[in-house]
Amino acid sequence: MGQSVSSEEETKQDYRTVKVSKGQLQRLFDKNCLSLLTPIEVYSLKENLHVRDINNDKQLSIDETVQLLGLPKDCPCNEVVYDFVRVLGWFPFFNSVDPLKGISLPMLIRSVVLSRSKSFFKLFKGDSSYKFEDLVFLVLSILSEPKDLVEKNLDSSCDETGVLELALQGDSNIHWAQCKVIKDFDNTNIKERKVSAYNLAIFLTFLLAISRPLMSDYSQHLSQWSNFMSHGMNLVRSFDSSITERSLHSKTVGYAAFISTIETKMPNVLHPLDALLDSLLFMKQSKGASDVTPEFSVSTKLINEYSLAQLSTVLPLELCYSRLRKLYVGSESGFSMRSFESKCFNWNAPTITFISGHRITSKKTKRYLLFEEQFPRSRAAEDETGSDFDHANDDSARLTFAVFLNQHWKTSNKEPFGDSKTTIFQLSPRQAVFKSSTFRKDYCYFNTSGGGIGFGNEEPYLKNNTTKFRPGNVSLTIDSGLEFCVFRHLGKGGSFNPMVLEDDSIPVYEDRFVISDLEVWGCGSEKELLEQAKRWAWEEKEAMARQRINADTLGEERAFLEMAGLVGNHGASGGSV
């Protein structure tokens, strides 16, 4: 490896350990990181930093880093992003973080390699015991520490000559994930650490703003910070439903809540970090406009650049940004089952249905009282009202749900449809994912006899002008007038799995709201989109052909109707046949 190490060895599993100094380990790690960059990437990095030597002692200030990354000068995220890159660059010696030092070139290279999923995987040889989410949490927790505490840790940890263990496979193949200083995060008990809710909100909002693939310039999206921030708050409340914008500076998020929330509610949220520092690895003029994913061209109240960014935390990027087609928007086509059917039933590919509104505050209207007779409140949910989980803060908050349906829509007055890929999402005021279970298969129904639309329900009881909904333990129900919606969450045993909190408890609650927006968007692969376009073109051609036939026979038909006295002005109310 080009560095001398002592000969003290001991056998451990399939690798052995040797003793090295802190300085030796750091140099070996830096050499490994550099080897994971291509020559053109190293060249571009030096050109962008205006240095000739990769070992240059130049240190980047926050202003220089902001300019290099193309961030707006006064963006609220600048300090958090700069400190994240800087602290990540101290890897693996996190107890040696110096709050007074800038970002050196070796630190920047470490941050580049560690933040990119491909190089991270190669560096740690795909060892699943060392998780990227753990590393991100640790860095954010260090950012949340008071500076005097960071300086105290620095004073007690700096020792270039300290003896450390280096894990080797074979003669010189270093197994970094099994090195003690890396495996235990520089002797840090990560499970006892906390992340500031404010830093987390800023960090997540930044990730949403840069989530669009192949974005060459962050400034345009970051200039819309407040719009992304509202969706970032939806994500933050997923970690702790009691967090509000006012309590951001006083609230914290622990390790268990951070990891479980990332894994179950927003598995893709950290993916934008993959390209965070990519702009430094390319010459500025080398990215053309054709390389950039175009802006989303069709926006509605529920679907726009900001909501798509949040949706991409649970769904694939290519689906969110290039495979959506507007099918039905209630505010444009009317809130009726017939309009819904006419717009959606010809789409023979997966769809995402979005439902949004505000909690019902006036419970004395005739229409709602009738709906409450058809869908009685859950006693179990009423008994739990006022719990710590209680509905994410206040009645004025907008509730937004989405349902991914893998099969095409159809009328189902007797049997439900859908498959195991059907998934319910909550998007505001917090985010949650409710995947299908194997216990029941009542995934979806579209009932044209007065039963409305249901996900996770049995078909409603409809007889003698009586309607009774039969909701599942985790279900989303829309009445036949597309006016009211209920999300019920009582526990296990239904067609969808419930949310499980950090302490393994299952919250019991029910959200009832008046629908203000209802939209359906088609999605699928390029092949499916092309086939659908051909089908629609054929249907349009057939419709035009029928119109021509009607026009050709109009004269004969009218003459017959006039003879029967059914059309024309004959001075009489009608004729007889």
From Swiss-Prot:
Pfam families: TLD (PF07534). PROSITE patterns: TLDC. SMART domains: TLDc. One of its GO terms (cellular component) is nucleus. Residues 301-524 form the TLDc domain. Keywords: Cytoplasm. Disulfide bonds: none annotated. InterPro entries: TLDc_dom. GO terms for biological process: protein-containing complex disassembly; response to oxidative stress. It comes from the Eukaryota. Its main location: cytoplasm. The keyword Cytoplasm applies. It is found in: Cytoplasm. May be involved in a process influencing telomere capping. Belongs to the RTC5 family. This is Restriction of telomere capping protein 5.
